[in-house]
C-alpha cells in the first residue's frame, strides 16, 4: 500500500524506529510484574491460630496444647482448642483424648514469616473464612484490565495512540504507588483495578504504535521483541521479589518507574498512519518529515507535500470520512468474521495461561524457582514462534502454539500426581506454548484489522482475554468434583480454539489493511491482484515527488 512506500521514503527502519520501539516496549518489563504480582504480594505462608490472650503457655504445656493437628502432624490453620490439651490432639491420625472441642481463630493467626515477611494475606488476615478475599484482589485487577481494554482501545482510535499511552503511564504510576500505601484491603483493590485498566491500554497501544511505524517486513520483529521484553520481566519479578519480600516495597518498586515512562512518552511521535485515516494530512506530513529528519533523510522529507500525500493516500482519505465504531465489528460481515474467530483465540489463550501461572504455590517447590523457570521457557518458545511466523506465517504459528499447549495440559491431567517432575515439565512446556500464542495473537490481530478500527479490535480481543483470565480461577474449583477436571478443561479449550485459526487469512508479507474493502478482498482471496490494480491506478510516489520538484 502507499503508506508503506512513504515509510521507505523517510528511512524505513532508521534511527527513529529503533529509538521509539525501544522506549515503547521498555514498560513491558514491569507490566509482566504487575500481571503476576499477587503470586508474591498475596502469598499464603504457613499459619495457625493465635492462643487466647489469657493463655499461659508455660503452664498450659506450650503452644501445641492449643493447636489441633492434621493427619500429617501439622497444626491446623483455622481451628484451635477451647482449652489446652494435655497431649497432642492426634496420634496416628486419631484424636488422642477425644474430648477436645475446637473453635475458629478468634484472636488472629501466627504466620511463618521465614519466606514471606509481609504480604496482604498476613497484614489483613486473608485466610480461613476470609480466604476468598485474596482472589478478589486479582479478580478485580483482571476486571480492570477488561474495562481498560474496551475503554482505551476505543479512545486510541479516537484520540490517537500517543495521547492514550501518556495517560496510561501516569495512571499506572499513580494507582500502583497508591496501592503500596493502602490503609485497608478495599482501598488496595480499588487501586489494583485502576492499575489493571491502564496496563491494558499500555499493552494495546505499545504494539500498535510500533507496528504502524514499521515497514511490512519488520513487523514480526517488533512483535517478537515485545514478547521477549515481557518474558524478561518475569525473570525480573522473581529476582526483585526475592530481594524485596515486603509486599508494600515490592508494589512500590514495580510502580514508581512508570513516572519515568510518563515523562519520556511526551517525546513519542504519533502514528502518521493514524493521522492519515481521520484525514489530518497536515499532521501526517509533519510527522513524516520529523521522522525523516531523525532518520537522516531530511531531503526526502522535504520533498513530501500535501499534494503527494493526497495522491498516494487517496483511498485512505476517502474511507476516513466515516469513522468506524465498535458496532462495526458485528455489523460488517468481514469484521464480524474476524471478531468471532479472534475472540475465541484470545479467550482460549488467556484462559489456559492464567490457569497455569497463577498457581505457583501449587507446584510444591520454591515459588521463586518456578517463576524463573516459567520465564525461561518463554525464550526458546518465542524464538521458535518467531521463526515459524517469519517463514511459514502467522496462521500456522498461532494454530500450533494453541494446539501443543492444550495437548500438554490434557496429558498432564492423566499423569499420576506423585510424578511431580513430569507434571511440572509438561506445565512449563504448556506455558511456553501459551506465551508464544500471546506473542502471535497480538501481532496477528493488529495485522488483520483495518487501521480505522485496529485499536478497537485489539481492545475487544484483549477484553475476551480478560474474560478468560476471570473465568479461569472459577474452573479451578471443579477440582472438588474430580482432581484433574480443571486440567482437562484448561487443555480442551485451546485445542478446540486452535481450529478457528484455519478460518483466518494469512498476513505474512501482506500490507496492513486500512479499510473494510481490504478485508473483503482478502475474503475473496484476491489481495495481491487488487493491490496490483491499485498500483496501476495510483501515481507512484517517486514520480510524484519528481514532478513536484520539476525534475
UniProtKB/Swiss-Prot annotation:
It is found in: Basolateral cell membrane; Basal cell membrane. The chain crosses the membrane at residues 24-44, 136-156, 165-187, 196-216, 225-245, 249-269, 338-358, 369-389, 396-416, 426-446, 485-505. One of its GO terms (molecular function) is sodium-independent organic anion transmembrane transporter activity. Belongs to the major facilitator (TC 2.A.1) superfamily. Organic cation transporter (TC 2.A.1.19) family. Involved in the renal transport of a variety of drugs with well-known nephrotoxic potential, therefore may play a role in the etiology of the drug-associated nephrotoxicity. Uptakes the diagnostic agent PAH/para-aminohippurate and clinically used drugs. Mediates the bidirectional transport of PAH/para-aminohippurate. Multiple cysteine residues are necessary for proper targeting to the plasma membrane. This is Solute carrier family 22 member 6. It comes from Oryctolagus cuniculus.
Amino acid at each position: 500500500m502507499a503508506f508503506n512506500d512513504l515509510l521507505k521514503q523517510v528511512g524505513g527502519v532508521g534511527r527513529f524506529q529503533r529509538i521509539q520501539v525501544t522506549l515503547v516496549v521498555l514498560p513491558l518489563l514491569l507490566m509482566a510484574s504487575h500481571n503476576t504480582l499477587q503470586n508474591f504480594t498475596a502469598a499464603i505462608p504457613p499459619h495457625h491460630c493465635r492462643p487466647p490472650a489469657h493463655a499461659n503457655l508455660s503452664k498450659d504445656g506450650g503452644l501445641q496444647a492449643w493447636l489441633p493437628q492434621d493427619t500429617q502432624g501439622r497444626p491446623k490453620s483455622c481451628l484451635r482448642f477451647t482449652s489446652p490439651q494435655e497431649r497432642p490432639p492426634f496420634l496416628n491420625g486419631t484424636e488422642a483424648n477425644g474430648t477436645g472441642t475446637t473453635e475458629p481463630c478468634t484472636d488472629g493467626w501466627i504466620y511463618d514469616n521465614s519466606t514471606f515477611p509481609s504480604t496482604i494475606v498476613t497484614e489483613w488476615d486473608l485466610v480461613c473464612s476470609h480466604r476468598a478475599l485474596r482472589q478478589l484482589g486479582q479478580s478485580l485487577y483482571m476486571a480492570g484490565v477488561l474495562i481498560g481494554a474496551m475503554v482505551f482501545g476505543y479512545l486510541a482510535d479516537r484520540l490517537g495512540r500517543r495521547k492514550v499511552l501518556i495517560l496510561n503511564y501516569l495512571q499506572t504510576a499513580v494507582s500502583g504507588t497508591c496501592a503500596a500505601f493502602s490503609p485497608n484491603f478495599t482501598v488496595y483493590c480499588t487501586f489494583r483495578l485502576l492499575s489493571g485498566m491502564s496496563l491494558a491500554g499500555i499493552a494495546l497501544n505499545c504494539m500498535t504504535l510500533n507496528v504502524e511505524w514499521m515497514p511490512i517486513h519488520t513487523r514480526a520483529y517488533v512483535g517478537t521483541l515485545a514478547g521477549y521484553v515481557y518474558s524478561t520481566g518475569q525473570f525480573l519479578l522473581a529476582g526483585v521479589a526475592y530481594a524485596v519480600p515486603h509486599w508494600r516495597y515490592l508494589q512500590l518498586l514495580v510502580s514508581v518507574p512508570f513516572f519515568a515512562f510518563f515523562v519520556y512518552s511526551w517525546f513519542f511521535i504519533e502514528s502518521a498512519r493514524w493521522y492519515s485515516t481521520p484525514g489530518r494530512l497536515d499532521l501526517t506530513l509533519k510527522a513524516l518529515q520529523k521522522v525523516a529528519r531523525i532518520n537522516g533523510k531530511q531531503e526526502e522529507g522535504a520533498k513530501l507535500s500535501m499534494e503527494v500525500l493526497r495522491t498516494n493516500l487517496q483511498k485512505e482519505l476517502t474511507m476516513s470520512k466515516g469513522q468506524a465504531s465498535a458496532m462495526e465489528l458485528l455489523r460488517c460481515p468481514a469484521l464480524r468474521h474476524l471478531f468471532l474467530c479472534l475472540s475465541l483465540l484470545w479467550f482460549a489463550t488467556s484462559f489456559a495461561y492464567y490457569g497455569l501461572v497463577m498457581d505457583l504455590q501449587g507446584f510444591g517447590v520454591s515459588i521463586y524457582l518456578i517463576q524463573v523457570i516459567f520465564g525461561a521457557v518463554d525464550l526458546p518458545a518465542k524464538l521458535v514462534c518467531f521463526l515459524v511466523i517469519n517463514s511459514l506465517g502467522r496462521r500456522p504459528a498461532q494454530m500450533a502454539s494453541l494446539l501443543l499447549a492444550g495437548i500438554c495440559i490434557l496429558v498432564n491431567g492423566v499423569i499420576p500426581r506423585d510424578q511431580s517432575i513430569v507434571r511440572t515439565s509438561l506445565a512449563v512446556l504448556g506455558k511456553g506454548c501459551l506465551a508464544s500464542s500471546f506473542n502471535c495473537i497480538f501481532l496477528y490481530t493488529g495485522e488483520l484489522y483495518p487501521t480505522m478500527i485496529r485499536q478497537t479490535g485489539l481492545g475487544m480481543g484483549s477484553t475476551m482475554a480478560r474474560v478468560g483470565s476471570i473465568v479461569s480461577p472459577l474452573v479451578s474449583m471443579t477440582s472438588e468434583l474430580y482432581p484433574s477436571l480443571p486440567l482437562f478443561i484448561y487443555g480442551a479449550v485451546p485445542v478446540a480454539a486452535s481450529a478457528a485459526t484455519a478460518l483466518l487469512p494469512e498476513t505474512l508479507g501482506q500490507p496492513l489493511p486500512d479499510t473494510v474493502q481490504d478485508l473483503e478482498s482478502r475474503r475473496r482471496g484476491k489481495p495481491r491482484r487488487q493491490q496490483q490494480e491499485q498500483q496501476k491506478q495510483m501515481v507512484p510516489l517517486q514520480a510524484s515527488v519528481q514532478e513536484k520538484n520539476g525534475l
